[in-house]
Design a protein with these regions (language model features):
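Compact beta-sheet-dominated domain cores in extracellular/mature segments
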Residues: 2-7, 21-117
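Bacterial N-terminal signal peptides
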Residues: 10-19
């Protein structure tokens, strides 16, 4: 992990993310406390997770009026929603995570990974 990613993750944690559960383990979580993931099969900032995949891995969607650090951007999905990207990679939740701090999706299929500080 580069120093830029580490610095950005720290800024993001201070600005947007909660300090419960996943955050305490060095994993980034949304304000609702649910762990955030990236997918190795995505190409750049474009998601390749739709249909059945998106049911298991819901996109972390947002709007342009939300304020985020520089490493966080919005990318259009084919369904018209805007998905958050972190360091150029689309960001997801895992439907199998049931409680704040769960990270049951980490490493699944060798292609899903928790975003870590």
């Amino acid at each position: 992990m580069t120093n830029t990613i580490k610095r950005s993750a720290a800024v993001l944690a201070a600005i947007m993310f909660s300090a419960i559960g996943a955050q305490a383990a060095g994993m980034l979580a949304a304000q609702n406390g649910m762990t955030l993931y990236v997918f190795d099969k995505d190409k750049g900032d474009q998601s390749s997770c739709y249909d059945d995949c998106a049911k298991k891995w819901p996109a972390y969607v947002g709007t342009a009026d939300e304020k985020m650090p520089a490493d966080w951007k919005l990318a259009a999905r084919t369904d018209g929603t805007m998905q958050w990207t972190y360091d150029g990679k689309p960001v997801y939740f895992f439907a199998g995570d049931k409680a704040k701090g769960d990270a049951a999706g980490d490493g699944l299929g060798g292609v899903w990974h928790v975003i870590k500080e």
